[in-house]
């Protein structure tokens, strides 16, 4: 299983914001420069993260983006569920004639649940706290 770039960059954006001093604002432009991703793509990601409460977006001259809640309260599994379409196969009778008797979907769903269960054990704070190499890579030019 591979996460979509949408989820990948969503997690990266959250990691970047969590690496900043608590409450510090950043901008979508700054995040896109750090990761070298399209601004349009990042705008869509930040909008989704904001809609889900993971990011707070403030408009205006002194506006910007920052975490919508403490990094310790952001569960990695919740972020992945919010951003990632988690269907591994297209199991509708329209696309596959064995759908009525197939057990593969059950097995794959169990695998996804175990994957998410593991991600639920980790917070955004765990990914960034006391991580000097990460701070250096992300924040040296900020």
UniProtKB/Swiss-Prot annotation:
Binding site for [2Fe-2S] cluster: 91, 96, 102
Residue span(s) of domain HTH rrf2-type: 2-129
Residues passing through the membrane, by range: none
DNA-binding region, residue range(s): 28-51
GO molecular function: 2 iron, 2 sulfur cluster binding; DNA-binding transcription factor activity; double-stranded DNA binding; iron ion binding
Top-level taxon: Bacteria
Keywords: 2Fe-2S, DNA-binding, Iron, Iron-sulfur, Metal-binding, Repressor, Transcription, Transcription regulation
InterPro entries in the cross-refs: Tscrpt_reg_Rrf2 (IPR000944), Tscrpt_rep_HTH_NsrR (IPR023761), WH-like_DNA-bd_sf (IPR036388), WH_DNA-bd_sf (IPR036390)
Cofactor annotation comment: Binds 1 [2Fe-2S] cluster per subunit.
Single GO cellular component term: cytosol
GO biological-process terms attached to the record: negative regulation of DNA-templated transcription
Cofactor(s) annotated in UniProt: [2Fe-2S] cluster
HAMAP family given in the database record: HTH_type_NsrR (MF_01177)
Biological role: Nitric oxide-sensitive repressor of genes involved in protecting the cell against nitrosative stress. May require iron for activity.
NCBIfam families the record matches: PRK11014.1, rrf2_super
Protein name: HTH-type transcriptional repressor NsrR
Name of the coding gene: nsrR
């Amino acid at each position: 299983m591979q996460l979509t770039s949408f989820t990948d960059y969503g997690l990266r954006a959250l990691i970047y914001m969590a690496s900043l001093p608590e409450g510090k604002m950043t901008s979508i432009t700054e995040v896109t420069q750090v990761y070298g991703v399209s601004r349009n793509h990042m705008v869509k990601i930040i909008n989704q993260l904001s809609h889900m409460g993971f990011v707070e977006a403030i408009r205006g001259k002194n506006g910007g983006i920052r975490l919508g809640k403490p990094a310790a309260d952001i569960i990695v599994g919740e972020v992945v569920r919010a951003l990632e379409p988690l269907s591994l196969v297209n199991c509708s009778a329209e696309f596959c004639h064995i759908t009525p008797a197939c057990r593969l979907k059950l097995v794959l769903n169990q695998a996804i649940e175990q994957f998410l269960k593991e991600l639920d054990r980790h917070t955004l704070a765990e990914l960034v706290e006391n991580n000097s190499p990460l701070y250096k890579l992300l924040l040296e030019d900020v």
